[in-house]
Amino acid sequence: VYRIGGAQAVAALAYGVQGIARVDKIVGPGNLFVALAKQHVFGDVDIDSIAGPSEVIVLADHTARADFVAADLISQAEHSPGSGVLITWHEPLLDAVEGALRQQLVELDRGGLAAQSLREYGALILARDATEAARLTDELAPEHLHISMDDPESMLGLIQNAGAIFLGHHTPVALGDYIAGPSHVLPTGGTARFANGLASADFLKRSSIIQYDRQSLEAEAEGVRRMAAKEGLTAHSASVDIRLR
């Protein structure tokens, strides 16, 4: 365990310094300088992702409590910068959440920072129905998705893109930050469209193993010859033919 941090730690781990051997992979979130340092060393070492600001979408219906929703939006916004977005098809919830946000922000130590984040990166969105709400969520592909409904499982089949999904009124996103168990290193900035959260599989490698005998090689030789001829790579064909003389 090394007591180091920041961009300088990324450099030390990527290239090695006295007392620290270079590594093959660097993972985990950090500030802007850490993110840019990881981007710079990628290729010399592997990385997990370029982590952006924290973000949450709350997908809520008429059963959601406005104070619960507001608390989840603020909890991510207090990272500053952080993004908090509510998508609902129950119009009265928009005004109720806006009022709850104002009340809670003045009561919190980091309320000023969270308020600034919500002004710059927050949104309260009214969808036509649950299907449109799910489509908008998929387009945004959030790091955290909180489905605040009595039957949140009903939305899972409509959602493809989210780093971590929190179901029900009593599953705040903070559980995933600290206690719940699944990876907290999650795709941000819309990258949940193609990326997953960090997992044990990210620390494993695979190698393909191929073995043919002479009979199997003879059966496939003509296919190799034809493709090699198309590409003009005669040595490829020759490496097969020399074994079949």
What are the residue ranges of the model-derived segments?
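Gly/Ser/Thr-rich active-site loops/lids in small-molecule metabolic enzymes
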Residues: S49-E55, G82-I87, E91, D95-G99, ...
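A glycine- and small/hydrophobic-rich beta-loop-beta segment
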Residues: S75-E78, L86-A162
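Conserved NAD(P)+-binding/catalytic subdomain of aldehyde/semialdehyde dehydrogenases
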Residues: Y2-G84
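Short, basic, helix/turn surface patches
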Residues: V1-L13, I26-L36, G112, V173-Y178, ...
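Electropositive phosphate-/nucleotide-binding environments in soluble metabolic enzymes
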Residues: R3, A7, N31, I50, ...
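Short, well-ordered secondary-structure micro-motifs
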Residues: A14, A37-Q39, V69, A96-E98, ...
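C-terminal core of ALDH-fold dehydrogenases
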Residues: D138-R245
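Structural motif
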Residues: V1-Y2, V23-V27, N31-F33, D48, ...
